[in-house]
C-alpha cells in the first residue's frame, strides 16, 4: 500500500486519468504472456468517457469557442459520454443540455440531472438520429449554444493519444505486444 499522501485537487477534473493497470493473473494463468487491464472505472465518474468529456470541453475553451457562464453546451448522447460531459460542465461552470433517446436507463438520467444537466428525451424509435436532430434544433435556437459533436470531434480520440496510451506504455515499462479495446465514437 502506498504511504504517500495524495495532494488535494483544485477541482474534480484534476483527478481524470492516471488510472492503474493490473495484471489479470487468473485470466492469463496458462498463457505464455501477461494480460493487464487499465482500470478506467477508477475515473471520477467510473468511466473512460470522463477523459473525453473533459478533453472536448477543454479543447473548445483553448480555441476560444466557449466560455464558462456564457456558453450553453449541447450534445446528443446515449451513454457515459453525457455523464463525462455533465460532470466536467458542472465543475467548469457551464450549462449543459443533453438530448437522448427515452429508452436510456433511469439511472443514467438521474446522474445527468444530479450534475445539473438539462435532459431532453427523444423518441426511442428514432434512436440516436432523433437525439442528434433534436440537439441540432436546440442549437439553432440557443444564443451562445455550442455542440461538442462527439462523433466528429478530434478532441474525443485525441485524449487517448495524449494520456491513455502513454499511461499504458509507462505503466507496462514499454512492454506492450498487443492491445484490445472496444471502439464506438473513438472515445473509448
UniProtKB/Swiss-Prot annotation:
PROSITE patterns: CYS_SYNTHASE
Subcellular location(s) per record: Cytoplasm
Keyword Lyase: yes
Family annotation (PANTHER family): CYSTATHIONINE BETA-SYNTHASE
Signal peptide: none
SUPFAM superfamilies to which the protein is assigned, alphabetical: Tryptophan synthase beta subunit-like PLP-dependent enzymes
Protein's name according to its UniProt entry: Putative inactive cysteine synthase 2
MF (Gene Ontology): lyase activity; transferase activity
Family as reported in the entry's similarity comment: Belongs to the cysteine synthase/cystathionine beta-synthase family.
GO cellular component: cytosol
Broad class of the protein's primary localization: cytoplasm
Swiss-Prot/TrEMBL cofactor(s): pyridoxal 5'-phosphate
One of the GO biological process terms: cysteine biosynthetic process from serine
InterPro entries: Cys_Synth/Cystath_Beta-Synth (IPR050214), P-phosphate_BS (IPR001216), TrpB-like_PALP (IPR001926), TrpB-like_PALP_sf (IPR036052)
Superkingdom of the organism of origin: Eukaryota
Amino acid at each position: 500500500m502506498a504511504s504517500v499522501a495524495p495532494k488535494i485537487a483544485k477541482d474534480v477534473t484534476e483527478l481524470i486519468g492516471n488510472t492503474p493497470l493490473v495484471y489479470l493473473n487468473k485470466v492469463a494463468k496458462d498463457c505464455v504472456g501477461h494480460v493487464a487491464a487499465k482500470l478506467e472505472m477508477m475515473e471520477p465518474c467510473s468511466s473512460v468517457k470522463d477523459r473525453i468529456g473533459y478533453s472536448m470541453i477543454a479543447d473548445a475553451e483553448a480555441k476560444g469557442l466557449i466560455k464558462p457562464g456564457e456558453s450553453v453546451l449541447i450534445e446528443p448522447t446515449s451513454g457515459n459520454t453525457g455523464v463525462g460531459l455533465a460532470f466536467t460542465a458542472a465543475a467548469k461552470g457551464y450549462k449543459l443540455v443533453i438530448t437522448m433517446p427515452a429508452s436510456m436507463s433511469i439511472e443514467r438520467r438521474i446522474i445527468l440531472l444530479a450534475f445539473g444537466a438539462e435532459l431532453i428525451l427523444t423518441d426511442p424509435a428514432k434512436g440516436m438520429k432523433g437525439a442528434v436532430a433534436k440537439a441540432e434544433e436546440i442549437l439553432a435556437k440557443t444564443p451562445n449554444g455550442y455542440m461538442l459533436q462527439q462523433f466528429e470531434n478530434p478532441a474525443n480520440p485525441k485524449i487517448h493519444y495524449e494520456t491513455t496510451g502513454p499511461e499504458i506504455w509507462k505503466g507496462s515499462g514499454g512492454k506492450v505486444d498487443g492491445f484490445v479495446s472496444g471502439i464506438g465514437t473513438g472515445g473509448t
